């Protein structure tokens, strides 16, 4: 092979081109590539961090939901218990009131019955005295009438 001056000139020109590229072109390319790698690494790291935060938030949200459900159940249980207590209290009060009304009714009936019996005794005694006066044909004195009426009332 014949080496001539053109080949040496091309070799020198190529070497200068490579040196120029290594000095001025290559460093900005490497810098841009490294920046992109750093940006991609940061983005992946941020994405992983966001994914972890989302998972943590989901767990916290589920815990809060469970806690809220438990608290709601406690409130419902407390309200149910309070409702039952109120119902029992109202039923007991109603039962007491019912017994009081029944006793009051019985007392009124008894007093009315006694009043009617006493009235009936007095009328029967008065009728008996009136009948006896007619039979006897004379009037007995008032003190004797009252004494006889009291005895009849006591017997009835």
From Swiss-Prot:
The keyword Transport applies. Gene3D superfamilies: F1F0 ATP synthase subunit B, membrane domain. GO terms for cellular component: plasma membrane; proton-transporting ATP synthase complex. The keyword Ribosomal protein does not apply. Keywords: ATP synthesis, Cell inner membrane, Cell membrane, CF(0), Hydrogen ion transport, Ion transport, Membrane, Transmembrane, Transmembrane helix, Transport. It is a single-pass membrane protein. One of its GO terms (molecular function) is proton-transporting ATPase activity, rotational mechanism. The chain crosses the membrane at residues 7-26. It holds the Pfam family ATP-synt_B. CDD domains: ATP-synt_Fo_b (cd06503). InterPro entries: ATP_synth_B-like_membr_sf, ATP_synth_b/b'su_bac/chlpt, ATP_synth_F0_bsu_bac, ATP_synthase_B_chain. It is found in: Cell inner membrane. F-type ATPases have 2 components, F(1) - the catalytic core - and F(0) - the membrane proton channel. F(1) has five subunits: alpha(3), beta(3), gamma(1), delta(1), epsilon(1). F(0) has three main subunits: a(1), b(2) and c(10-14). The alpha and beta chains form an alternating ring which encloses part of the gamma chain. F(1) is attached to F(0) by a central stalk formed by the gamma and epsilon chains, while a peripheral stalk is formed by the delta and b chains. F(1)F(0) ATP synthase produces ATP from ADP in the presence of a proton or sodium gradient. F-type ATPases consist of two structural domains, F(1) containing the extramembraneous catalytic core and F(0) containing the membrane proton channel, linked together by a central stalk and a peripheral stalk. During catalysis, ATP synthesis in the catalytic domain of F(1) is coupled via a rotary mechanism of the central stalk subunits to proton translocation. Belongs to the ATPase B chain family. This is ATP synthase subunit b. The lineage of its organism: Bacteria, Pseudomonadati, Pseudomonadota, Gammaproteobacteria, Pasteurellales.
């Amino acid at each position: 092979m014949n080496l001539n001056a053109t080949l040496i000139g091309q070799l020198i020109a190529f070497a200068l081109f490579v040196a120029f590229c290594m000095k001025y072109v290559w460093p900005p390319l490497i810098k841009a590539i490294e920046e992109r790698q750093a940006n991609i690494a940061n983005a992946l790291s941020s994405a992983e961090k966001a994914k972890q935060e989302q998972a943590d938030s989901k767990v916290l949200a589920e815990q809060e939901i469970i806690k809220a459900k438990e608290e709601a159940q406690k409130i419902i249980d407390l309200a149910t218990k309070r409702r039952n207590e109120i119902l029992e209290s109202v039923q007991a009060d109603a039962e007491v009131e019912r017994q009081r009304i029944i006793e009051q009714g019985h007392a009124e009936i008894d007093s009315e019955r006694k009043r009617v019996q006493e009235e009936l005794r007095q009328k029967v005694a008065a009728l008996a005295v009136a009948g006896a006066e007619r039979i006897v044909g004379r009037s007995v004195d008032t003190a004797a009438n009252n004494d006889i009426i009291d005895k009849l009332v006591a017997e009835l």
